[in-house]
Every structure is written in structure tokens, then in C-alpha cells.
Amino acid sequence: MKDGGGAACELVASNLADKNIRLIGGGLPYVMKGKLVVGDGTDAGAQYLQIDPGVTIYSDSVAGEGASTDLDYVIVPVYSKMLANGAPGAPVTFTTSREVRTSGSSDSSTLNDNITADWGGLVFNGLAYQNKCNFADLGSAACTASGEGASGTYGGTNDADNSGNMFYTVVKYAGRKFNAEDELNGIAFQAVGNKTELDYIQTMNTSDDGIEFFGGSVNAKHLFVVGASDDSIDWTDGWRGKVQHAIIWQRYDSTNQTYSIDRSIEADNYGSDMDRGATNSFGAPLLFSYPKFANLTIVGDTLATNDKTGTAILLREGTGFDGNNMVVALDPHGCLDVDDDTTYDFNGDGTGEDYLSFKKAFWSCSSLTLTTEDGSGPTIAQTETMMTKNGSAAGTNSLTGYCNGANENAVVADDLSADSFFDATAHIGACSGSSADWTANWAVDPSN
């Protein structure tokens, strides 16, 4: 077909509903035509979408924030898989038509750093455990949840569920906010299991969150989240995955003089009354969110003095968090806000198992913490004590971009390789120096 003056291959719903599809690289780009669902959400109707290195897939329309019509997005329902097989120098790219169509097209308006929500993003639905279930026993067939943006149901009893893989994949200008309670992200992983493989993934300029985890146990390495309009990485509903090598870049909106992002990390669990002993109405114990991060760096563009005050990391609703070998460098923002007593109680404070901890964290913000958003939770002094245990400390960062300088590299990293998921690293943060920048040759440079 001809598309805005250039040729492209169409992807329509009927292509993916009942057959396996491979998108071949080295040729034309592909254009999304509406809501694309891989398979029919049943075991018998499972399909896969395989994408070769170097393939570009772009939206047919650029409806914009709030619009519910003309929405292009991809859903991988339970049982089906996406196999996005990008490679160094040849990533798989999902983007807006603005970037692909010729200047003669009606929606070829110039891209800029503040554009988001041109298309709906990617949604993966899995069969792993999640805790948003108050009407059936946890993990039973009836214990499922419905995704936002009419993205289907998810949840089950298989933490080893497999939704495919994403390697060297870039997702740009995606997401959609229909209203405050109904949103699509750059990528949503909904009860996705830990047999799914995620490595070298970038989201850029996404509406709502860059990446959000709704329960599940999926793990990821080499995440690069730039310029989300809400949070960069968000989790809720009992996510228990692991992440290593992650960069969050909070982009500054010079027009509105605010970050384009709300927080670098916003972490939830189930509700403000959630605690480790919580049960559903059937008396079944509820899972709580408890991810483990290592080698995370959070940075941002230079700010104007009238930028809104916020924090890099917000932990609330009884989430756990195991943060290791981290660098958090934002100014004039605070580094951490812990809300709700049930969240702080996970810190253990020497009285029990420590589900909320920071080990070898390097904090470089105008303040370590701010007062709690909702008035509950620990005092500033309690939070700062927690933040500076286990070899963690505040200091002046010497970063070049998101890569370490002498101050960060002076910290001796903890070795986490006893857990087979984690690589052994000698450095804290995501990148030991410019010569070790793992975003080169596949991701979009946010400084350009």
C-alpha cells in the first residue's frame, strides 16, 4: 500500500486473530491499523507475533491524549506471545506515523520532546499471580483482573508463564490517558510470568507511564525509560520481579517548566490498608509487591527554579522494595518518599524480615526525603536513617549523563551473583563510565 507518500505493509486485526505472523526485516515498515490482538485469548487460539531485527512498526493515526477512537495499539493476551527479536544496530521500533510518513502527509507535523500519546502502546497479559482479587481464592480460575484501556483480562496461577520475548526494542510516543482511572502506558506487563524474556528495552515520550507492572513475576534487564508524562516505572498488584541495569531519564519540559514525568518510580501494592497479613474475603493471603532492583540510575535534565517539587521514588500502599547498587541524582527534587505506615513497617527496623531496604545506594538530591504525600508513614528522620544503612549514603554526584564518575565508582558494589538472574558487577549504578554505555547502537539518545 501507499501511505502518506511512502510504501508500507498493513497490520490489521484479521492478520493476527487466527494465525502466526512474522514481520520480516530489511524491507518496508509496517503500519498498525487499529487495535491489534495476537490470538483470541484462549489456549486453543494462541498465536505469536514474531518481529525480525530492524523492523519499524508505526501508528496509522495520531489521535492524541484522551481520544478513544482511531487508537492503534497491540495486545498480547494470555497464552499468546510476542517475539520482538531486535539486535544491536537493528532494534525493533514501535513509533508514531509522524516519524515515518513523508512531509506530504496530514499528520507529519514535526516531532518535539513533549509529544506523547500518538498511539496506544503495548500490553502483555499473562497467567502469573496478582493480588487484585477480592472475589475468589487467590490464583483460582475466577481470580482475574481486567486491564485498563479495554486491554483484556489477566492473572492466574503460573508464575512461570511465558508471554514471549523483547530484545533491543524501542517504544516511542505511545500511551493514552482516557481519564484518571483508565490509561494505557508505553508498555504494560499485566500478570506476566518469569519465563518471559525482557532485555534491552527503551520507552521514550510515553503518555502515563513508561513501563508499568500489574502483578506477575516477570524480570527484566537493560531498561531505558525517557520522558514519560507520568511515572517512568510503576508497579502495583503484587509484582515480584527483578530488574538489573536500568536508566530513568526525567526529561524537562521547557515550555511548561516542569518535568515531563511525575516520578521516576511510583510503587503501589493493593491499597492503603494492605499489610503482610492481609487476606481477601475468602481468607486467602494476598501477595504483596516486592521487586528487587540492582544497578539502577535515576537522572534528569537541568531544572528551572520554579519546577514542581516531587521525589524520585514514591513507595506506598505496603509495597516492598529491595534496592541495590543504585544511583539517584535529581535536583532540586527529593530522592525518596515513603507513604503509609504499612510500607515503612516493611523496613523491619531490626524487628523482623526486611522487605524494604537500600544497599549501596548513592543519593544525590537537594534533600534525601520530603514529608509524606498523604501525611502517614515514617518521619523524615526515620526515612533518612533507613536510606543511609547498608553502605548507602548521600553525596555529590559526578555523573556524565547517566554514566558514573569518580564519586560513584568509589563505592564498592555488592555482589548479587549468588542469585543466577543478576550479573556480577564491580560498580553501582547502571553504567560505570562512557565506554561502558550499553544504550549505544540501538537506543535513542535523550540528550539529542
Regions found by a protein language model. Give the residues of each.
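Active/ligand-binding-proximal structured segments within catalytic/core domains
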Residues: 57
